[in-house]
Amino acid sequence: MPIFKEYTDFDAVGIAELIKSKKIQPIDALDTAIELIEKLDPTLNFMHQKTYHFAMESLNRNKELNGPFAGVPMLMKDMDSALYSVPMMQGSNYLKNIPMKFNNSLSKKFTNSGALICGKSATPEFGLMITTEPTAFKPTRNPWDTERSTGGSSGGAGSAVASRAVPIAHASDGGGSIRIPAAACGTVGLKPTRGRISFSPSHGDKWGGLTHSGILSRTVRDTAFMYNELFSQEIGDPYSVHYDKGTLINALDKNKKYKIGFNTDTRIPVSISDEAKNAVRFNAKICEDLGHEVEEVKIEYDGLLLSRAFVIIISSHVSQMFNELKDLVGRTYKKREVENASRMFDYLGKSFRGSDYTWARYTIQKISREVMQQTNDYDAVIMPIISQSAPLLGELRPKKSAELINDIVMTLRLGSLFRNHSIRDKLLNKLAPDSLWFAPDALLQNVTGQPSISMPTYYTDKDMPLGVQIAARYADEETLIDLASQIEKASPWINKKPNVS
């Protein structure tokens, strides 16, 4: 039996309150988390590295239990989370056994909050897939059905939080990677506004401003309290988004009435399942019953154009990432060390010209403006984040046709063909639906930079969670926390536990 047997009944704020009131000792929570990790991880594979020593050292240094999350166990994602002397493997054999030489800004903020970092959670290689099935590690499994995916790229965090091994975990989101695992695993996942959380000291932004750091949690209040600690800029950051301390905590009890739109469609040429549409309508009905003004809204944009621009930006940054990693590792990667899809992104990025990248940036900025103008009359918009409940493991891995194209292009060195816009567009038009079918509109708020939250309010006939996303205006997480808190009280999920927990 766990040392603190009620551990899984409490969220992170609840555990912190028990520790502060001396009803439990911080070592009790840490030992219980370690026991649960050791019990659950062999089945779920949500861990890439264990850092129990790091957690214990933090606890020994923080004898006064400073910070709102003092003594609360958590995980850091194995990306965007530099811990001194701990490798950041990013799901790749290429980076195994390469210790980091610094603590980044985000890991310092988590440590300053008092949270105890017990390990590095699983991620697909370099965060490039929306399923957490890297070839360097065992696939991460969904605790609701272990034959199914957790989504990605923060799938390890989603599985760990949903299974209640830890109440809170770091996540990051470059195209849905906070909200997709939240929706698939049944957790709360809020992607913040662009620029809220610094990537200092190593980067100004990631993926041209598309990537955002954040967390997964089990409750809205955990999200509000932790982001209250994380929201701040560092000197030299490329974006500045002011935050008044305490705003999100105060928003938990505002209970304002809002004008809310809902949309069940997508402009990416893929299908949204009936169950995903039902999930949107279910959440819209909750909002209507709460007294909010709710109406359907159509959002028009060129989905294929957006997906092409998205791939160009990502692949360009992946190529630059490999340049940086070469300096870190001391050599170029070997073919067997890096997955085919990752090498394809690298090769694509090297084939694009500066004008291609500029076109892609202008394109997403244009579409961002169009989307924000169409939705600006609404305080929040509800839309699908995933097109169905979690698919079986393997279904979100690259299709064989895509793998074959990868091999041909890289073997014959045909990357220059992508400089021909006609050939490039035809190929990307074919590949985009294959890569985006599970989460077609996940990237929309990465493009606009707006905050967006997913919550586990809806469950399918097979008792699988199927979250939706609710987006707000730029820099308005306050509205999302208020609305999400209202929805959580009207349709609570805290007592729903997955099969493996």
Show where each model-derived region lies:
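Short helix-loop capping/hinge segments that flank enzyme active sites or metal/cofactor-binding pockets
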Residues: 2-3, 69-90, 252-263, 316-372, ...
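Acidic/His- and Gly-rich active-site-bordering loop/insert found
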Residues: 55-57, 62-136
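Short glycine/serine-rich loop segments
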Residues: 102-234, 450-458, 462-467
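A short helix-breaking turn/cap at a secondary-structure junction
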Residues: 191-284, 301, 491-501
